[in-house]
Amino acid sequence: MKSGTLKTKGFKFKQFSIASSNSGMPVSTDGVLLGAWADFHHSQNLLDIGTGTGLLSLMCAQRYAHLSITAVDIDAHAMEAAQENFSHSPWHSRLHLQHGDVLKLNFTHRFDGIICNPPYFNSGEQAQATQRATARHTDTLAHDALLLRCRELLTPNGKANFVLPLTEGEQFLQLAQQQGWHLHRLCRVKPSPNKPVHRLLFELGLSTATTSEEHLTINDGSTYSAAFVKLCQDFYLKM
């Protein structure tokens, strides 16, 4: 691990820290859920699309010692934040950054794993800050274009993992089906037992598979649920 401290205060996990003030993507529960849930045991080369602060890449690097990870983002400030976070992590030698539009970037190889926390504001209200808008608005990365690009970049037996709010996730899955993707895994997430499902975690592949479905409740009363703690305890400091 390189010596030194992060220049910017941020969010500290058990094995790494995230400085996020220069990026439109602060640490979110969505990102932590996806990074903890996605399964890349059989992958060798992972592509993190829209890396932001690098959270997903760092989580996957911590979980899978064999992974070589390429992280891309169109936003220069996000690249700066990710570079800082990567350089102070124990896995910096396996983390590679590329600045640019994933729809236009050229890669030397395809990937057997893709992870992405996609933008999901389709129209109407824009985020106030420009970087936040870039991170969350589909004007910069439409879902149909994202899925098509993932098809081009994924190996035949590879897997692509995403997280989206319920409505946007259902629409995304419809687009995926139209493009010939297969739903391998699906997790419906709700914030508490009496609240409706508000997030979808899902794994897509180009090969046929029987869909594995599960449910996750984040809070159980005034505390985190046992299932949420089991999923995220390797990352959050107070678990």
UniProtKB/Swiss-Prot annotation:
Keyword Transferase: yes
Catalytic reaction list: adenosine(37) in tRNA1(Val) + S-adenosyl-L-methionine = N(6)-methyladenosine(37) in tRNA1(Val) + S-adenosyl-L-homocysteine + H(+)
Span of the signal peptide: none
GO molecular function, one term: tRNA (adenine-N6)-methyltransferase activity
EC id: 2.1.1.223
GO cellular component, one term: cytoplasm
Superkingdom to which the source organism belongs: Bacteria
Protein location: Cytoplasm
InterPro entries on file: DNA_methylase_N6_adenine_CS, SAM-dependent_MTases_sf, Small_mtfrase_dom, tRNA_Adenine-N(6)_MTase, tRNA_adenine-N6_MeTrfase
EC category: transferase
Family matches, as CDD domains: AdoMet_MTases
GO biological process: methylation; tRNA processing
Record flagged with keyword Transcription regulation: no
A Pfam family matched in the record: MTS
Keywords: Cytoplasm, Methyltransferase, S-adenosyl-L-methionine, Transferase, tRNA processing
First-listed, main subcellular location of the protein, grouped into a coarse class: cytoplasm
Family (UniProt): Belongs to the methyltransferase superfamily. tRNA (adenine-N(6)-)-methyltransferase family.
Function description: Specifically methylates the adenine in position 37 of tRNA(1)(Val) (anticodon cmo5UAC).
Protein name (record): tRNA1(Val) (adenine(37)-N6)-methyltransferase
Organism (species): Vibrio vulnificus (strain YJ016)
